[in-house]
From Swiss-Prot:
This is Putative lipoprotein LpqV. GO terms for cellular component: plasma membrane. Coiled coil: none annotated. A lipid is attached at residue 26 (N-palmitoyl cysteine). A lipid is attached at residue 26 (S-diacylglycerol cysteine). The keyword Transcription does not apply. It is a lipid-anchor. InterPro entries: Uncharacterised_LpqV. It holds the Pfam family LpqV. The keyword Lipoprotein applies. Keywords: Cell membrane, Lipoprotein, Membrane, Palmitate, Signal. Residues 1-25 form the signal peptide. It is found in: Cell membrane.
């Protein structure tokens, strides 16, 4: 069987298309750290946010995003609040998160940013810090 005279052209087109796909797949379209302070929270699809029967967000399936210092601040603020409450441990996580989420101006545990204005990654960081505070693991 004799190769078509268009075979080299077809091969070149396939290679060019493969190269473009690889370049597009490797392009950097991520956000910078400056974008982290956005005042608009991201929206997550249903099922990736855990909400208690009382309506408190207790889980956000996103990677927690905070610096070590921010984590410590959030954890310490949660711990101070928990120490002032009756009860201890895991039972205080949901009530604490309810306070954080209801605050019109944010609290120290959310870096003084309203819950609704935090990105899902920042909401996850607040929840991680609250869980650590309940277990006295702020560091």
């Amino acid at each position: 069987m004799r190769p078509s005279r268009y075979a080299p052209l077809l091969c070149a087109m396939v290679l060019a298309l493969a190269w473009l796909s690889a370049v597009a797949g490797c392009s950097r379209g991520g956000s910078s750290k400056a974008g982290r302070s956005s005042s608009v929270a991201g929206t997550l699809p249903a099922g990736v946010v855990g909400v208690s029967p009382a309506g408190v967000t207790t889980r956000v399936d996103a990677p927690a995003e905070s610096t070590e210092e921010e984590y410590y601040q959030a954890c310490h603020a949660a711990r101070l609040w928990m120490d002032a409450q009756p009860g201890s441990g895991e039972s205080l996580i949901e009530p604490y998160l309810a306070v954080v989420q209801a605050s019109p101006s944010g609290v120290a545990g959310s870096w003084h940013i309203r819950w609704a204005a935090l990105t899902p990654a920042r909401q996850a960081a607040v929840i991680v810090a609250a869980r650590a505070a309940a277990n006295a693991e702020c560091g």
